[in-house]
Amino acid sequence: MAKFTQHTGLVVPLDAANVDTDAIIPKQFLQKVTRTGFGQHLFHDWRFLDDAGQQPNPEFVLNKPHYKGASILLARENFGCGSSREHAPWALTDYGFSVVIAPSFADIFYGNSFNNQLLPVKLSDEEVDELFKLVDEQEGITFTVDLENQVVQADSKRYPFEIDSFRRHCMINGLDSIGLTLQHEASITEYEKNQPAFLN
């Protein structure tokens, strides 16, 4: 995985609570097991007026011209709730998002996000309210999310956030479960050499 230390990007506000995984990526688009190609179906039922995805909904925030290219999603509480599907962070990252900021996340979605190099940032309800107001007042505003120092820089204000130290380490160093295992490759090889022949 790519290393994540700091990200600066355009912010798009999704002012809705309890956004579930079926809204993020509807079930009819889950046939693939690769991580790419899901971005075109992100928030399909909200982004489009037709089932074929040919008629964009002009009222949906992601379809607003000034949010084109957004890479930071600002959301409300309990983001990513509903059924467990890793396709949800796949769709978000494939669309171009690197960070989701919200007061809270569903547990499974939260874990899946780290596994797919999507940074979920938890801030308080009051802080998220401030950020929504800021985005509304300053069209096209960008935030800087500094994972190393655990802070969101928005305009002139800094918002510290907490994150598990192990997950932070993995994202900063671009480590998934395979990468973590390979860090101990020499020890694993040495261990295998010392096992009885009938175990090999």
From Swiss-Prot:
InterPro entries assigned to the protein according to its UniProt record, in alphabetical order: 3-IsopropMal_deHydase_ssu, Aconitase/3IPM_dehydase_swvl, AconitaseA/IPMdHydase_ssu_swvl, IPMI_Swivel, LeuD
Q: Which SUPFAM superfamilies match?
A: LeuD/IlvD-like
Per its record, the protein catalyses: (2R,3S)-3-isopropylmalate = (2S)-2-isopropylmalate
Provide this UniProt record's keywords sorted from A to Z: Amino-acid biosynthesis, Branched-chain amino acid biosynthesis, Leucine biosynthesis, Lyase
One GO-annotated biological process of the protein: L-leucine biosynthetic process
Citing just one GO molecular function, the answer is: 3-isopropylmalate dehydratase activity
> Origin, by domain of life?
Bacteria
- State the pathway, as annotated in the record: Amino-acid biosynthesis; L-leucine biosynthesis; L-leucine from 3-methyl-2-oxobutanoate: step 2/4
Under Gene3D superfamilies, the record lists: Aconitase, domain 4
What's a GO cellular component annotated to this UniProt protein? 3-isopropylmalate dehydratase complex
- The EC number on file is 4.2.1.33
What family is this?
Answer: Belongs to the LeuD family. LeuD type 1 subfamily.
| Protein task | Catalyzes the isomerization between 2-isopropylmalate and 3-isopropylmalate, via the formation of 2-isopropylmaleate.
What assembly does the database describe for this protein?
Heterodimer of LeuC and LeuD.
Q: Would you tell me the protein name for this molecule? A: 3-isopropylmalate dehydratase small subunit
Q: Tell me the lineage of the source organism.
A: Bacteria, Pseudomonadati, Pseudomonadota, Gammaproteobacteria, Enterobacterales
